């Protein structure tokens, strides 16, 4: 069986963590790309030298030329400028749009058949731009947002209930930003919905509301603590989970930023936004359209409209 090739475009904190995690899971050989000379080569060599200790057989290489990603099965894009304290994800549109143009051309030329996972912020509009520039089919490109946001939601719920992370399921829909929609009604502990846990006296609605808001602010909380950058361990773990679902045809149900066609989820037109999907060897194999109540639908529409607003800004910058 041919070895899988995973290309990481961007060799910063997330890129380096991705490379390490991919090796530990032996998902395939890794090529790290970056425009900064020496960085992908150095990180690649460092991680390669850890493989005898870990007992994993993965090959690592670093490059500054897009030709190195030729034939990749999966491309994970983290290239771009991260947030600093006081910035919103949306402040990065103009800078990172130019990065997506270059990355998209690199993918189109060298690995148009790859499954593409975008992690660059502002997430939803960057996925739209990357698909526009790369020409990758909509089912083969996704944004990493909901997996991370749901993981943060689950983390805070685990802390509140003092239970195992394995027993908490949570869904976050919508754009990756302040308008994201953590769905309390569809989130459970061992199959018990959160509203029932309130009735059982495990928590209060007020505490759940605080957890929902902390989830929305999860990225900013870490940015403000780090002061010099943004989160990378949890985003990398989330990206690897998505890549693994594709490479192993796991048919996992994961919330990702994907192309939601007009008419789906009550949307008037097409928009890249976070919804649950099934990821397998065909990429996004289907969208899971869960039933939303009026309040949830209104929140989701608000989130999707925020993404549309950013896409409009991006189109203006593209001329």
Swiss-Prot record:
Disulfide bonds: none annotated. Pfam families: Ldh_1_C, Ldh_1_N. Keywords: NAD, Oxidoreductase, Tricarboxylic acid cycle. InterPro entries: L-lactate/malate_DH, Lactate/malate_DH_C, Lactate/malate_DH_N, Lactate_DH/Glyco_Ohase_4_C, Malate_DH_type3, NAD(P)-bd_dom_sf. SUPFAM superfamilies: LDH C-terminal domain-like, NAD(P)-binding Rossmann-fold domains. The active site is at residue 176. NAD(+) binds at residues 10-15, 34, 96, 119-121. CDD domains: LDH-like_MDH (cd01339). GO terms for biological process: lactate metabolic process; tricarboxylic acid cycle. Gene3D superfamilies: Lactate dehydrogenase/glycoside hydrolase, family 4, C-terminal, NAD(P)-binding Rossmann-like Domain. It comes from the Bacteria. NCBIfam families: MalateDH_bact (TIGR01763), PRK06223.1 (NF004863). Belongs to the LDH/MDH superfamily. MDH type 3 family. This is Malate dehydrogenase. It comes from Paramagnetospirillum magneticum (strain ATCC 700264 / AMB-1) (Magnetospirillum magneticum). The gene is mdh.
């Amino acid at each position: 069986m041919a070895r899988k090739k995973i290309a990481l475009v961007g060799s910063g904190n997330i890129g380096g963590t991705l490379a390490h995690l991919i090796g530990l899971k032996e998902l395939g050989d890794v090529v790290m790309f970056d425009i900064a000379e020496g960085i992908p080569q150095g990180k690649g060599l460092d991680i390669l030298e850890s493989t005898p200790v870990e007992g994993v057989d993965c090959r690592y290489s670093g490059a500054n030329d897009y030709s190195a990603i030729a034939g990749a099965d999966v491309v994970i894009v983290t290239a771009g400028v991260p947030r600093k304290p006081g910035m919103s994800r949306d402040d990065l549109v103009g800078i990172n749009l130019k990065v997506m143009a270059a990355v998209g051309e690199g993918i189109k030329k060298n690995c148009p058949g790859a499954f593409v996972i975008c992690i660059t912020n502002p997430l939803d509009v960057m996925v739209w731009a990357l698909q526009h520039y790369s020409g990758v089919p909509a089912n083969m490109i996704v944004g990493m947002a909901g997996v991370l946001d749901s993981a943060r939601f689950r983390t805070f719920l685990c802390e509140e209930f003092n239970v195992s992370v394995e027993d908490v399921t949570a869904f976050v829909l919508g754009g990756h930003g302040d308008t994201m929609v953590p769905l309390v009604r569809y989130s459970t502990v061992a199959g018990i919905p959160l509203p029932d846990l309130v009735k059982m006296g495990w928590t209060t609605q007020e505490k759940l509301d605080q957890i929902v808001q902390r989830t929305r602010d999860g990225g900013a909380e870490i940015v403000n603590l780090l002061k010099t950058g943004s989160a990378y361990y949890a985003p990398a773990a989330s990206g690897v989970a998505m890549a693994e679902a594709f490479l192993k045809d796991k048919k996992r149900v994961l919330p990702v930023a994907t192309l939601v066609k007009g008419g789906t989820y009550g949307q008037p037109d097409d928009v890249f936004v976070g919804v649950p999907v099934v990821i397998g060897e065909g990429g996004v194999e289907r969208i899971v359209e869960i039933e939303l109540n009026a309040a949830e639908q209104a929140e989701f529409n608000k989130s999707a409209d925020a993404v549309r607003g950013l896409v409009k800004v991006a189109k203006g910058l593209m001329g």
